[in-house]
Structure formats: structure tokens, C-alpha cells
Amino acid sequence: MRTPTIRAAVAVLGTCVIAACHSAPEPEPQPIAVIQVPSPVRYTGGEQVLAAMRARYDGKWYSTLTFRQKTSRLGTDNKWNDQTWYEALRIPGRLRIDFDPVSAGNGVLYVRDSAFTIRNGKALPPTASINPLLVLGFDVYHESAARTAALLRKEGFDLSRVHYASFEGRPMIVVGATAGDTHRPQFWVDVERLLFVRLIEPTPRDSTRLQDIRFTNYRQVGEAWISPRVEIWSEGKLVFFEEYSDIKTAVALDDALFDPTRWNSAKHWMKP
């Protein structure tokens, strides 16, 4: 899972997008089609949307998840560079990413509102950090709407701005911007399924440019869902993507996996 908030410490965690982009000016965004909503519900505020997401899957969304991730970044030479990451989630608020090889002890750990970069099994000092993809793609289905809303406001989303649009043939609720505005931080939610689909935000190192992050190819897992492919687009070009395999939910995970002081000693889900 892309980790956009550890931007300076780990280049591949979101800042990799910047390396793939050239200095051309941001093109004018294409007009967004405004649609009539087929649902009887008309949301007028972002917190209403978050509450509906929580209510739809209350008691149905998995609380643990593991997967192997192929991470592909487009280099300045226009060639794709691939890495393998191993990820474990305890929802809400905990995400562990091990970089291949796991034995090297390198990775990133999110624990609630803090993030740790791990090098050689040792945690660097934490930074206050929120991962909006973790919040919107997973935590929202376990947290209260008030808690999720507070986190997103900290990240610069204006929850008072809501409109409806379409994306890839499906109706969407857009929170954070008015119709036609693609320059404000905003997230898109599928009207029918109430699943997070898209996030548009300024790039980490240049706030005048945008990146478009997409959760794609959703598939059902029991009564919940998972997106096994995440894409990042910049200036109309795919520059980064993640593909998940060996996906498992309801996994028994050692609590120590999410303790930065026990990175190497925790019982790892990848090891027998």
C-alpha cells in the first residue's frame, strides 16, 4: 500500500511518483461529468458519507489482512522498476510493510497516528503521520465517522464540499471539492458499494502538481471487499502501481508485529 506520509525518509513510499515526473506544467484537467444519483440518499456533507460507509459494512469488514505486494515505479528512463513488499494490517490504524528480503529488517510501520521507518530492524524516531489510503480504504469501516472525519480534516480535506460525478462508468460521491474542481484534495466513493475508489491530492514535493491515486479491480471477500491493484497517475500517465497476491483475511497476527521495538523478534506471518 502506498505510504504517502513518510515522504522524505523512504523514497519509494510515495515520493517515487515525483522521480517519475518531468517538469512540464500540469495540463488542464478534463471536465468531470456531473450525474444524477441513482440512490435515494443525497449526501450533503463528507461526514455523512463516512458514516454511511461505516454503517454499510459494520461488523462485516475484516480486521486483519496480509498480502504480498509487487510494487512498480516508472523511472526517469521510462523503464519500470519492481520491488516486493510484504504487508500486514490490523484494522484500524496498524500497517506493517516489510521490504524484500524480510530478513534484512527494513520497512515501515504505521501505528495509529505515528509512522516509523525501520532500518536493519531498528526503528528511527517516529513522525506524526496519517496514511489517508489506510484511513479511507480500511479504517473507515471500523472507526467512528467522527474519528475518520477528524483525521481527514487534518490531511486538508474540506468535508463540507460534496458533489456527484462518474468514474469508469460508475456513479461517485466526491468529497473535498465542488464540481469541476480537481485541484483540491478530494476522495471519491462508489455510490452503490460505498467503497473508496480515488484520491486526488497535491504531489508530496510540489503542491502545484497533482497525483491521482486509484483503488481498482475490487473483488469481494466474504461480505467485504478488497482492491488488489492500486495505481498512481500523474499528468495523465501511470507512474506507479501495486498488485497484491496471496491475499488472506482474518489472519491471526502477533501483536508484536506492530511494536517498533520488536521488529525482528515478532512472529512474522511470512515465516513458518
Question: Where are the model-predicted features located?
Answer:
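Bacterial signal peptide processing site
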Residues: H22-P25
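Gly/Pro-enriched, hydrophobic low-complexity segments
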Residues: A104, E168-N264
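N-terminal mature ectodomain segment of secretory-pathway/periplasmic proteins
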Residues: I35, V41-A123, G156-S160
